[in-house]
Swiss-Prot record:
Subunit text: Interacts with BAP1 and BAP2.
Name of this protein: Protein BONZAI 3
Organism of origin: Arabidopsis thaliana
Pfam families listed in its UniProt record: C2, Copine
Molecular function as annotated in GO: calcium-dependent phospholipid binding; metal ion binding
PROSITE patterns listed in its UniProt record: C2, VWFA
Keywords from the UniProt entry: Calcium, Cell membrane, Lipoprotein, Membrane, Metal-binding, Myristate, Plant defense, Repeat
Encoding gene, per UniProt annotation: BON3
Length: 584
């Protein structure tokens, strides 16, 4: 999620680059078959995924003594609980002999995924003396004495300031269910590789001209070669207008993006087109190690153009030059979160008449007596259940828009809980209760306006910013309709782009959501207000429910994939460090 690009963007072409934009097709035509958020999720979850690696160190205190002539010989096993309830073993510690207060040395590594609720289950065993010379990975757990179990969510550990969580062990053991089974402590540490970045200054010379009446408008797209599928885009530069010898601002590639310094990277130079069909100028394949050598040896790499007849690629006169290569460590998303930064959740629900009468099963707002969630409930639950772990008080502002309230007027930002003052509810369950209550007390009306709820969220973020609060706000808008106030919404989003705020939009139903794709800046352009102001950064992420691939990826996974990157773009552009951390 790296990206050294910073500063105000003066135009749509320049706004294509920056912190890891959503990927486009690797073909020259650059056509996209699915929503960008969903595409990005699938492509980044290939053989070499892009998440932070976390090392967990375990220790225990006051374990149960199951041995007669000595103390227990404990070993810990960690599992990840899957959605269907199955336990997937992630790793085991070593066995420590004759010790009821073990401090295991063997670390267990797990990949942190912000967009998922990762439930960890820990089992502690007393390993029988007969198996002390057997490798721990081959031990049959059914042959060992069970000492207790602990469960937590990985984000619970990562949000602690010292990244340490202590669990009370429970479970049915032979000594009885009510006996004190001791505690298990988990300490998490993000690997250095997750924070290491390569900062690179690129320029090109002698590029081929692809335009008739002017020079090309080139930018670079860098992709990682993946063995099992097409290359995965990981970074783009800004566009340089009308220039065949362009020089770009520095880009940052994180080690978690490129895997290792020897991993092949495809570097494409493309001519920007406003249609989104960017034309390939040339490409080259280099690893990070090779880019470093180009810089040290002051050499250049020639671009090639793919042969349409599958023959030899055409070598071009255009060259890629690396003017500067520096490796450094940056603070990660988890550094900020564990230091005390919070993500504050807000939600806005569409109460326009196009949703259909909530009393009929065909309505998008229908509350099924069987407990089956409608699309609005599903989006609230999935997004809220992830973000709630990053909010200490779990008090969430919840609004509705496009509904006729009890006073007979249509409101585009009414409190979902029905209160005249105070828009907060407690927990995700509180949002669900307030939503169901509002359906009974608010009449569906219209039109569909976003600007009011965006302004309310921006006001909250602005107040927090003025108080120097370490908070970042996430507004979830769930809608079924076509926007009536497109210009007003764009203006509100451009104003909000300066604030610690991201806007997640879920489209429900079968409406044409082309407008939402425009808000999501999927063509590489940042939003431009009615007065000509360009958004400081892209703060919108959109996904339609119907575009989720056969249930293989949830709404929350597609929506939240880029949120840590948006957060980092904000804090890094303002040179904000984790609480108590020195500048680096």
């Amino acid at each position: 999620m790296g990206g050294c690009l910073s500063g105000d963007v003066k135009g749509g072409k320049q706004a294509i680059g920056g912190v890891q934009q959503r990927p486009t097709s690797s073909t020259i035509a650059n056509n996209a078959a699915h929503n960008d958020a969903v595409d990005f999720f699938f492509r980044s979850r290939g053989q070499y995924p892009l998440f932070s690696q976390i090392e967990l160190t375990l220790s225990a205190s006051n374990l149960l003594d199951c041995d007669i002539t000595s103390k227990s010989d404990p070993m810990a096993v960690m599992y990840l609980r899957k959605k269907d309830g199955r336990l997937e073993e992630i790793g085991r510690t070593e066995v420590i002999l004759n010790n009821l207060n073990p401090k295991w040395i063997e670390k267990i590594t797990v990949s942190f995924q912000f967009e998922a609720v990762q439930t960890l289950v820990f089992h502690v065993y007393d390993v029988d003396t007969r198996y002390h010379n057997v490798p721990v990975k081959t031990l049959k757990l059914k042959d060992q004495d069970f000492l207790g179990e602990g469960t937590c969510v990985l984000s619970e550990i990562m949000t602690r300031q010292n990244r340490t969580l202590t669990l009370t062990l429970t479970g049915n053991v032979r000594a009885g269910v009510n006996r004190n089974l001791g505690t298990l402590s988990i300490q998490a540490e993000e690997t250095v590789a997750s924070k290491t970045v390569a900062e690179i200054n690129f320029r090109c010379v002698n590029l081929d001209n692809k335009d008739l009446f002017s020079k090309s408008d080139p930018f670079l797209r860098i992709s990682r070669v993946v063995e099992t599928s097409a290359a995965v885009p990981i970074c783009r530069t800004e566009v340089v207008d009308n220039n065949l010898n362009p020089m770009w601002r520095p880009v940052c590639l994180t080690m978690q993006q490129f895997g290792s310094k020897d991993t092949p990277l495809v570097i494409e130079c493309l001519d920007f087109n406003t249609s989104g069909n960017h034309e390939l100028i040339g490409k080259t394949e280099k690893s990070v190690a090779e880019l470093e050598r180009l810089c040290l040896q002051k050499e250049a790499a020639n671009f090639v153009y793919p042969s349409l007849s599958h023959g030899r690629n055409k070598v071009l006169k255009g060259q890629l030059i690396v003017d500067r290569y520096v490796e450094k460590v940056q603070y990660s998303f988890l550094d900020y979160i564990s230091s005390g930064f919070e993500l504050n959740f807000m939600v806005a629900v569409d109460f326009t008449a196009s949703n259909g009468d909530p009393r009929t099963p065909s309505s998008l707002h229908y509350i099924d007596p069987s407990g089956r969630l409608n699309s609005y409930q599903q989006a609230i639950m999935e997004v809220g259940e992830v973000i709630q772990f990053y909010d200490s008080d779990k008090r969430f502002p919840a609004w509705g828009f496009g509904g006729r309230t009890s006073d007979g007027s249509v409101s585009h930002a009414f409190n979902l809980n029905g209160a005249s003052y105070g828009d907060e509810v407690v927990g995700v369950e509180g949002i669900m209760v307030a939503y169901a209550s509002a359906l009974r007390n608010v009449s569906l009306a219209g039109p569909t306006l976003f600007s009011n709820v965006v302004d309310k969220a921006a006001h909250t973020a602005s107040q927090s910013l003025s108080q120097n609060s370490p908070k970042y706000f996430v507004l979830l808008i769930i809608t079924d309709g076509v926007l009536t106030d497109m210009a007003g919404t764009v203006d509100a989003l451009v104003r909000a782009s300066d604030l610690p705020l991201s806007v997640l939009i879920v489209g429900v139903g079968n409406t044409d959501f082309k407008q939402m794709e425009m808000l999501d800046a999927d063509n590489g352009r940042r939003l431009e207000s009615s007065t000509g102001r360009i958004a400081t950064r892209d703060i919108v992420q959109f996904v339609p429910m119907k575009d989720i691939h056969s249930g293989l990826v949830s709404v929350v996974q597609a929506l939240l994939e880029e949120l840590p990157g948006q957060f980092l773009t904000y804090v890094r552009s303002r040179k904000i460090n984790p609480i108590g951390a020195p500048a680096i």
